[in-house]
Amino acid sequence: MSAFTPASEVLLRHSDDFEQSRILFAGDLQDDLPARFECAASRAHTQQFHHWQALSRQMCDNVRFSLVAQASDVADCDTLIYYWPKNKPEAQFQLMNILSLMPSGVDVFVVGENRSGVRSAEPMLADYAPLNKVDSARRCGLYHGRLEKQPQFSLESWWAEYSIDGLTIKTLPGVFSRDGLDVGSQLLLSTLTPHTKGKVLDVGCGAGVLSAALASHSPKVRLTLCDVSAPAVEASRATLAANGLEGEVFASNVFSEVKGRFDMIISNPPFHDGMQTSLDAAQTLIRGAVRHLNSGGELRIVANAFLPYPKILDETFGFHEVIAQTGRFKVYRTVMTRQAKK
């Protein structure tokens, strides 16, 4: 994190107004402004493990990664600065959670890019902290209000689920394909054959649907699942539990917290980080897989057909094959051999 996002640049236009504020930053924290902003005190809460990694280097214990904020995260903050994400249910979940912990009268600022739907903040918070737009620049909006009424927040009420092939998939706001199985994952699932064995790592596990489906017809697999998203980690744990399946699930920035080697790595890697297009996670996945695959181990990923993954696969492993495709998606497979670049 170094360059500021457009949303942060809009906030900096008002930096003099925050010099005496004790601020809690939350939402889609794409840069390190929370660590560098000049104010009386600064704390941050994030559901994204990679954002926590970046901010904790400067903020230490004043930034926390978790599914829900707690009273200790709010502490004595008198101001909330919330960065609007592209996912409206995710924003509602986070805002209702955080505002339920803050006392009436605190200042509430919401900032985000217009294309993210930040205008939705006004009707969303109308009953709790009526907002007014105070700035519009860099194709972003900045809104301000004061908390008049604390919302009620119960984590249990935010859980949702859907079924696929007899499996119960548990989901939360902010989890990829929360409302049902996406087409890409469906294509990848079609290539996973019964009686698969060995250690399988599911990177970017989302709600855990790939691992649950694999384990349902291949009971001898040993599952490890990871994701940068706290909602995804909790949803995957809940999905495994709901279907009587076992597996280790934890937060990781691709391989950052992964130990050991595996017989198969599966993934539907993201190519967005918030509103921004980013191939970083997929490149890290492909290039880093050689350090986490056993000899003869397999990497199998699904991706939009237009993304430049074949080149990276060939550079890293020496070859790749397409084992399934539609007009929009391709499933790539490659194997750990001596020619792979370790």
Curated annotation (Swiss-Prot):
One of its GO terms (cellular component) is cytoplasm. The keyword Zinc-finger does not apply. Signal peptide: none annotated. GO terms for molecular function: 16S rRNA (guanine(1207)-N(2))-methyltransferase activity; nucleic acid binding. Specifically methylates the guanine in position 1207 of 16S rRNA in the 30S particle. NCBIfam families: PRK09489.1. This is Ribosomal RNA small subunit methyltransferase C. It comes from Salmonella paratyphi B (strain ATCC BAA-1250 / SPB7). The gene is rsmC.
